[in-house]
Amino acid sequence: VPYAFPAAAPTLSGDLLTISRFLADPVRVQRRLRDYKDLRFVADQLLIDRQRSQGGAVLYDMTEPFVTDRTVEAVSAGSEYPYANLATGTAGLAAIAKWGQKVLLTDEEITRKSWPMDAVDRALAKVVNSIIKQVDTVAMAAIGTAITAEVATVGSWDNATVANRKPLDDILLGIQAMEDLNLGYRADTLVVSPKAYTYLMLNDAIAQLRKRETTDNPVYTGMIETVANLTVIKTPNLPVVTRAWIIDSRQLGGMADERDSAPGYAISDLAVEVKAIRQDERDAWDLQGRRKTVPFVQEPGAGYEITGVVS
């Protein structure tokens, strides 16, 4: 009888031994976290600047001028260029907070699944999603507090009279208001609640101006990705769900994360760190997740708030 030499390595099916080996390896857990593409921080999309902190706090400049402190002059041939100073804004300091929790995953929960990895995926996703929700809530509150420019809607997006719904007017006027500041802001993002998002898709004026013969129409996709060249982001974590924000995400601010290289943690692309800890006395695993971060708003003028967009 023919046989292979050397013998092939033994293979493992989706049993408890396989899952245990997976959870004990941070590299494998990290690779698995990359598959959770539907989990994403809204905060990281609105505050795109990134800073690293090692001392538990981050120092940043608020409302930094976008021009130098000297008027540009005509320079004669052969003359030296005049020096100008790069003005700085008001210094701000934010303390890093560690947001985290853990859940218990028993061996019985794993083995009683027809596909044991489902139990691990569900537990990991819930831990990561809970951290996302908390960090997003804190970041959105920070943005909402910092934004001071606001105006009432021209016509609420869910107005009982369809003709009085004016989301496009609100958006275009908001973009104009930011540009009128002449501070270099370029609006690129619209942030709305799920209800406002729905009425944005239902609006007749916007629907009539969109391309008709295309498969990216909201009637097919259930999504509206851009309006007036703004990326539309839907989140239930707005501090006031009846309002909408127009922001310049490149200028608004950022997130400062702290990494301490603690052993056993798998770090995902989301900046969430996850660690699996075996509890032999309980025949279970602790799945522990955390993110050490703080949001900071550098340019309050890079945000514009529209009030009363929905009831």
Where are these regions (language model features)?
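Helix N-cap / beta->alpha transition motif
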Residues: 104-108, 191-196, 248, 299
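Extended, solvent-exposed, turn-rich assembly/linker loops in the middle of proteins
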Residues: 147-220
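Assembly/oligomerization interface modules of large self-assembling protein complexes
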Residues: 31-101
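Intrinsically disordered or highly flexible coil/loop and linker segments, enriched in small
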Residues: 39-45, 52, 133-140, 184, ...
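Sequence/fold signature of self-assembling virion shell proteins
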Residues: 2-30, 203-311
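Long, contiguous amphipathic alpha-helices that act as assembly "spine/axial" helices in icosahedral shell
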Residues: 86-151, 183, 190, 279-294
